[in-house]
Amino acid sequence: MNKRMILLMVVSTLGVGTILSSCNKVEPEDEKEVEVEWVDLGLPSGVLWANINIGATVPEDYGQVFGWGETETKVEYSWANYAHGKDFYGLTKYCSDTNYGLDGFTDNDVNLREEDDAAVANWKNGSRIPTKEDCQELKNNCDDQWTTRNGVTGRLFTAKNGNSIFLPAGGYRWGTELDCTRRNGAYWTRSLNANEPGGAWYFGFTEERSYIYFAHRSYGRYVRPVKYTK
């Protein structure tokens, strides 16, 4: 299997795994090496997909959840503490419609900047959150099936070249509650829904199907990074 690998350091803090780059200093008894494999699925764009989520140590781990455009995890996910707006119609960043911006704000940015990309901030290895188009390409060019791996439910995406990635069904977080675990997968793209910019596109799935839809940006969802080769 054609894979490109990096090593990351994971530090356990209050039970939550935090991803740091290998150059960060950590206490030896707390450090743990995590091998991230960049999987070549033979996609037309040449995009490589990571084999684990941000915050995970193995493919079956759910990892960490993030609000759209936020680079740190939180206890609660809501508009009350969202970084880029006060509510669905009170946006302060990433807004393409004056009806959704606070006091008519717009900036017409429809993709996350690197400064607001959780993959860039947490892994620092050239990875990015995938775009809506990256997820559609994955869906179009792989056979995806609902399966269970090591007791964890999710969807397995298998390419024509035989390589595959597993996305666990970790649900999503709204408020302080983690909902739909083991039944739904919900992964952010870095693409804004330009028609309703209070929402952003995510790659979701159930046992029956995978799909791309949009949700409130303040929701907590998982991130599966990609790396571009072209």
Please place each PLM-identified region on the residue numbering.
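C-terminal, surface-exposed recognition/capping segments
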Residues: V26-T98, L102-K230
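Hydrophobic helical h-region of N-terminal Sec-dependent signal peptides
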Residues: V10-G15
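Bacterial N-terminal signal peptides that target proteins for export
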Residues: M1-M9
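C-terminal motif of bacterial Sec signal peptides marking the signal peptidase cleavage site
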Residues: I19-S22
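Intrinsically disordered, low-complexity regions
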Residues: N2, V16-G17, V223
